[in-house]
């Protein structure tokens, strides 16, 4: 039972991550007025990977790699936390 629960939890986290990257890309592609093909070319991310990100809800098994998220962050001059919409708390 533990393995099953762990798998479900992992799947939910992966879906949430893929969905967050998708939402970030939808916003940025619109702002920058660029398309998926151009993004794939300038970031050296395979077009199929960009397409899979953009179909995040439909593709439940897809989880973008950290390297892919890093390339997206570098291109848009932001942090990986911004790409995945993770809130960073300062404890100062």
Curated annotation (Swiss-Prot):
Top-level taxon of origin: Bacteria
DNA-binding region location: 36-55
Pfam families according to UniProt: HTH_26
SMART domains xref list: HTH_XRE (SM00530)
Keyword annotations: DNA-binding, Transcription, Transcription regulation
Keyword Transcription regulation among UniProt keywords: yes
GO MF, one annotated term: DNA binding
Domain HTH cro/C1-type: start-end pairs: 25-83
Protein name: Uncharacterized HTH-type transcriptional regulator RP766
High-level lineage: Bacteria, Pseudomonadati, Pseudomonadota, Alphaproteobacteria, Rickettsiales
